[in-house]
Amino acid sequence: MALARALAARPRLLLLDEPLAALDQTTRARVRHTLRRHLAGFGGVCLIVTHDPVEAVSLADRVLVLEGGEAVQDAPPAEVTRHPRSPWVARMLGGNAWEGTAGPDGTVELAGGGLLTTAPGEAIPPGPGALVLAVIAPEAVSLHLARPEGSPRNVWAGTVRELTAVGSRLRVLVTSPEVPALVAEITPAAAADLGLTDGTRVWTAVKATEVTVVGL
């Protein structure tokens, strides 16, 4: 109702500060859809302030990300999602983000220790020796009770530290002495088949083609 009154005045500038923050998850999705429809026909400029990444990428034509009081990225939502410019941005959108140094052969030497392999022949911008950010989607991380065989180039032993429900799926936090902490996203059925609990020893695997690397 407040939005309808604001739009009825035909303002040239509309400021929405955390417009959906007070709503429950079900209502938020419905109102987000309605808000997106109304904003599509709004002739002025709308500025949305939010801490919700879903809200930002679904409602905005352009996203300005502030971290520590500084602008770290200003780009269309699709660009922010595909190529986040800081670990905070990537994690805000639900991804794993590791800082490191680009190697000469498509590898990334991770800042916290360990080595990450990217797709064969892929040129890592802006080149060897540069500081980069490696981003891995949680759904690209597979979990195993024994060391996996086959094609994965990135395989590490670790321990389950946390299981969190996200909608109809589970996010599993795995720590490892070889690489920084990693989040995998799997189905509850898969978690049950693996018998995952806090403290379960597992192997994590990530295909080289599932690693996205951007320059910092």
Give the label of every model feature segment.
Residues 113-164, 180-181, 185-216:
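Glycine/charge-rich catalytic "coupling/switch" loops of P-loop NTPases
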Residues 106-108, 175-182:
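Short, basic/aromatic beta-hairpin or loop at an interaction surface
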Residues 54, 78, 87, 96-98, ...:
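Glycine-centered loop/turn positions within well-structured domains
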Residues 81-107, 133-135, 154:
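C-terminal boundary and immediately downstream tail of ABC-type ATPase nucleotide-binding domains
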Residues 65, 108-109:
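Short aromatic-centered micro-motifs
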